[in-house]
């Protein structure tokens, strides 16, 4: 995967347009989690240190195109950026047609790009206007790399130079290391409520990994496919044959989907619901499975500790409720201890990593959700493809 790395360019005095992923949660005009902003700082800092004239934009939320809305304004982000960079960050509202100056070593934040007409549809006119603002376009928003929009794809077509930022390069290197040249054994942990939303990921990983660990609602469908009772647990009956087929396919090449031997149940989905440990054979008709049991968790921890590569996307239980979080905690602890290259991504996964305090013990944490999944599926990401094309000249 060959792209131009921004660190290989002379940026002094150049107008550098950075598409970052600053789509952070905002409440009452304040950013409530600044992880994505923090992840974008090295790229912005590199451009500033190189004495570039720096412009940064991002989307935030899902505003109506062509309409300004205060609730989706990047002003709260500008405040956090200024604080983290230790210098003022002007927010520029109507920027598409230019008309503003940026000094060397200055950074401005260009208001939410989704306020602009033609952004989402990747309109050529909009993309060309973006490109006219800069000498160098830097794509650093891996989180939106799976979308071909004016600020992720179109501008890269028309800008004089199109390069990848530090965060994007880091994401691509980590994902490439985990998926293209994995140290064996390779283990993938895929959690989530529905098989249907992660079916292509499961099918793609089933061809690559040595152990495919399934968790959450997805695991219930696999439990059913393995002939185990699941009571009233969330599952997708129409996908039971698909789950059986995946397990058979993996078994044929000596790989496996480990099936839980014990589970933690409740009668209803509630923060105060008592947790009851049961053998996977003894789930009652009115039970709901909310976590894996300690024996299953121990087996999975052993698999993780002996792995060469671990890809983690999704918890294995309802970890938001502590009584149903022990399975995910055991997995997190094993990921923290293993000598394997560990790659984690997805909102729920990052929440679990933060809850169990293993952030600095994971080899690489992807900031992306959808793009991370599409990469796992083996799909080409449009925003990366255009950077590859531009690198060829």
Curated annotation (Swiss-Prot):
The keyword Transport does not apply. It catalyses: (2R)-3-phosphoglycerate + ATP = (2R)-3-phospho-glyceroyl phosphate + ADP. Pathway: Carbohydrate degradation; glycolysis; pyruvate from D-glyceraldehyde 3-phosphate: step 2/5. ATP binds at residues 198, 320, 346-349. Substrate binds at residues 21-23, 36, 59-62, 114, 147. Pfam families: PGK. Its EC number is 2.7.2.3. Keywords: ATP-binding, Cytoplasm, Glycolysis, Kinase, Nucleotide-binding, Transferase. One of its GO terms (molecular function) is ADP binding. Monomer. PANTHER family: PHOSPHOGLYCERATE KINASE, PHOSPHOGLYCERATE KINASE 1, CHLOROPLASTIC-RELATED. Belongs to the phosphoglycerate kinase family. This is Phosphoglycerate kinase. It comes from Methylobacillus flagellatus (strain ATCC 51484 / DSM 6875 / VKM B-1610 / KT).
């Amino acid at each position: 995967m060959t792209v131009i790395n921004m660190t290989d360019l002379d940026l002094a005095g150049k107008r550098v347009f950075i598409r970052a992923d600053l789509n952070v949660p905002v409440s009452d005009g304040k950013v409530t989690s600044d992880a994505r902003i923090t992840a974008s700082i090295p790229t912005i800092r590199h451009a500033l240190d190189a004495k570039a004239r720096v412009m940064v934009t991002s989307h935030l939320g899902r505003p109506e195109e062509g309409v300004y809305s205060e609730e989706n304004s990047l002003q709260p982000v500008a405040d956090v950026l200024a604080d983290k960079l230790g210098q003022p960050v002007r927010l520029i509202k109507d920027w598409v047609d230019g008309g503003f100056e940026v000094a060397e070593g200055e950074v401005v934040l260009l208001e939410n790009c989704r306020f602009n007409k033609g952004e989402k549809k990747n309109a050529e006119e909009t993309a060309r206007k973006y490109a006219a603002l800069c000498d160098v376009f830097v794509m650093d928003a891996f989180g939106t790399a799976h979308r071909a929009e004016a600020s992720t794809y179109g501008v890269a077509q028309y800008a004089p130079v199109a390069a990848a930022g530090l965060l994007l390069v880091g994401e691509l290197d980590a994902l490439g290391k985990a998926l293209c040249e994995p140290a064996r054994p390779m283990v993938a942990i895929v959690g989530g409520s529905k098989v249907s939303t992660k079916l292509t990921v499961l099918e793609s990983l089933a061809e690559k990994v040595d152990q495919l660990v399934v968790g959450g609602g997805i695991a219930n469908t696999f439990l059913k496919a393995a002939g185990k009772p699941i009571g009233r647990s969330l599952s997708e009956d129409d996908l039971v044959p698909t789950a059986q087929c995946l397990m058979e396919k993996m078994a044929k090449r000596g790989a496996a989907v480990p099936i839980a031997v014990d589970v933690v149940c409740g009668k209803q989905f509630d923060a105060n619901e008592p947790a009851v440990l049961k053998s996977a054979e003894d789930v009652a008709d009115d039970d709901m499975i909310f976590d894996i049991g300690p024996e299953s968790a121990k087996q999975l921890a052993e698999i993780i500790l002996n792995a060469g590569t671990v890809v983690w996307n999704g918890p294995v239980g309802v970890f938001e409720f502590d009584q149903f979080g022990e399975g995910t905690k055991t997995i997190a602890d094993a990921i923290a201890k293993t000598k394997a290259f560990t790659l984690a991504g997805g909102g729920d996964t990052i929440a679990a990593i933060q809850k169990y305090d293993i952030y600095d013990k994971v080899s690489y944490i992807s900031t992306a959700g959808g793009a991370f999944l599409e990469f796992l599926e083996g799909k080409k990401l449009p925003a990366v493809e255009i950077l590859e094309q531009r690198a060829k000249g």
